[in-house]
Amino acid sequence: MDDFERKPELSPTAATLWTESGADPIGDLKLWRDLYEDENGTTPGAMVVSREIVTALANAPQFQVTMAGGGSRPATEADVQAILMANGLPPMTVFTRRTYSGPVLPKDRVLLLPPAVDTDDWSGTALGSTFWGQTLTAEDPAWGIAPLDRPGIVLGAYRNPKPPMIAEIISDAIGLPVLEDPNLSLVAKVL
């Protein structure tokens, strides 16, 4: 796995994994939040987790909800979010995207990142951006694409005017993700 020259201390492992007895998820997250702030001069603005991590947090004693009569129940996702925010931690986003080869992000890691930006914000964040190039297809006058709209994905449909009446869909794009500051990401193993 390539770390893109991120400082090793920004890839910690919880002293006690969060599914084990005696784990301190809130303490771990506060420690990592402070480490992130010491490194970057700002606190993280987002926390990205898997569904498995939400389940581990919901079942942790620190997150259990005490019921009338002394019983308790595991926290809901909303309870977990509220407890994290009450402890000065960034909002949690559950990321479950998969590809044919498996999850996009490891299920056992918490990511602390800068705040999310709008997907149309071309400048991205200090962490990085994705830049769209302009293809030759986009420059073809037959498409009628305005110059400002040419960078990005070009998609079109053609239909053969003579038999066989076949429709053809074509697409073309140039995209380049650019990582500007890998130290704006902290990736901690917790499960």
What do these predicted regions represent?
Residues D2-N87, P91:
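Extended, solvent-exposed, turn-rich assembly/linker loops in the middle of proteins
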Residues A15-E20, G69-L191:
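Sequence/fold signature of self-assembling virion shell proteins
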